[in-house]
């Protein structure tokens, strides 16, 4: 996902690592011998530890919530300190401190690489709950997140109903065929880069081209057609390239020079490579693909009936990765299962990325609920 508008960054009051001190068995059958979760805390739990808000990050986020959602921590922001305590936890599979493909496998002494096991959303929230136990946080005032973070928020309410008071899930539902197909293509872009080397690449020589292409395609899914048309239309690249020039005399007759939208996508891909790991991208997109709250239950309704929290689902009007009608349908299914559920729609031309691109509009939408 893209970054939100700039705001002064708020530093965590505490940042550290957690390990359960034992092997962690995964839903799909794998085992992590000694997993670690990186977490960050903003503010302090009160004496009753009932003022804690857990914010689950999206695909490329980290435990440092204020770094990627800064406007929500600014003066008057939804997550501004005071009587609140906000905790962010880097999910398993990521590359920002928690155990992921780039971590050392204690059984081999080498990075997990392609041997990193499949991690489910249920695995993610189960280990997060163990961290909360360690911190003596037994009930969460609110769990909120967007995209894969919203999946975590809903799964936390299903798996640990007694410890979640409220949920806000933004732009999240089980992926349908189009989303699964797009994630597959992004993974193939990485895997077909010769530098990927079957997942055994050196951190100094990662599959840059493949990851950059995957990110560029992902950015297309995070934005809306109307935003792209408004921003780029058919303008030539702002760097001075001429897409109407033949270029055949320079061996560019087939590739040509770029339109502005192409330059933007290339830039987004190149920038992303500097801050994210390709194998982590593979791992997290698979985690996203496989989220199915009904797994292990007789039906989705049976899973949803476990939820005790009040739930707010937020769809985004121009989101075509998680279309608003899918979010509304999920809300109806939750209500049918007896869940106290509200549904809101964030009207924006920014597509799936609106939760980051329009934090003020999001705050106005959520403020009455909070």
Q: Can you say where each PLM-predicted feature lies in the sequence?
A:
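N-terminal cap/lid subdomain of alpha/beta-hydrolase-fold enzymes
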Residues: 40-106
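Cap/lid segment of the alpha/beta-hydrolase catalytic domain
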Residues: 77-132, 181, 185-200
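Conserved hydrolase catalytic core segment
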Residues: 139-179
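Alpha/beta-hydrolase-fold enzymes
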Residues: 169-271
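Short alpha-helix in the alpha/beta-hydrolase fold that links the catalytic acid
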Residues: 296-300, 323-333
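Catalytic active-site module of serine/aspartate enzymes centered on a nucleophile-bearing elbow/loop
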Residues: 331, 335-370
């Amino acid at each position: 996902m893209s970054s939100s508008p700039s705001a002064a960054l708020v530093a965590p009051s505490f940042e550290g690592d957690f390990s359960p001190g034992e092997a962690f068995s995964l839903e799909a059958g794998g085992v992590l011998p000694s997993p670690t979760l990186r977490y960050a805390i903003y503010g302090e739990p009160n004496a009753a530890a009932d003022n804690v808000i857990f914010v689950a990050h999206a695909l490329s986020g980290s435990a440092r919530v204020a770094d990627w959602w800064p406007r929500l921590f600014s003066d008057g922001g939804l997550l501004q300190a005071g009587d609140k305590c906000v905790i962010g936890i880097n999910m398993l599979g990521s590359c920002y401190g928690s155990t992921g493909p780039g971590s050392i496998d204690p059984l081999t002494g080498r990075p997990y690489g392609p041997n990193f096991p499949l991690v489910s959303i249920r695995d993610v929230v189960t280990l997060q709950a163990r961290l909360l136990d360690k911190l003596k946080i037994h009930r969460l005032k609110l769990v909120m997140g967007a995209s894969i973070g919203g999946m975590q928020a809903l799964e936390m309410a299903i798996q640990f109903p007694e410890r979640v008071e409220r949920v806000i899930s933004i732009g999240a539902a089980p992926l349908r065929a189009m989303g699964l197909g797009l994630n597959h293509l992004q993974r193939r872009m990485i895997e077909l880069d010769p530098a990927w080397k079957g997942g055994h690449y050196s951190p100094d020589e990662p599959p840059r081209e493949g990851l950059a292409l995957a990110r560029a395609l992902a950015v297309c899914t995070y934005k809306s057609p109307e935003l792209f048309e408004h921003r780029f239309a058919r303008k030539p690249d702002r760097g001075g390239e001429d897409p109407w020039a033949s270029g055949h005399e320079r061996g560019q007759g087939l590739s040509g020079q770029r339109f502005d939208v192409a330059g933007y996508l290339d830039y987004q891909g190149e920038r992303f490579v500097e801050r994210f790991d390709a194998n982590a991208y593979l791992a997290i997109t698979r985690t996203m693909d496989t989220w199915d709250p009904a797994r292990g239950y007789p039906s989705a309704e049976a899973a949803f009936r476990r939820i005790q929290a009040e739930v707010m689902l937020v769809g985004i009007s121009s989101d075509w990765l998680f279309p608003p009608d899918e979010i509304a349908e999920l809300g109806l299914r939750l209500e049918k299962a007896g869940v106290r559920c509200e549904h809101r729609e964030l009207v924006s031309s920014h597509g799936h990325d609106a939760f980051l691109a329009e934090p003020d509009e999001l705050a106005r939408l959520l403020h009455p609920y909070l």
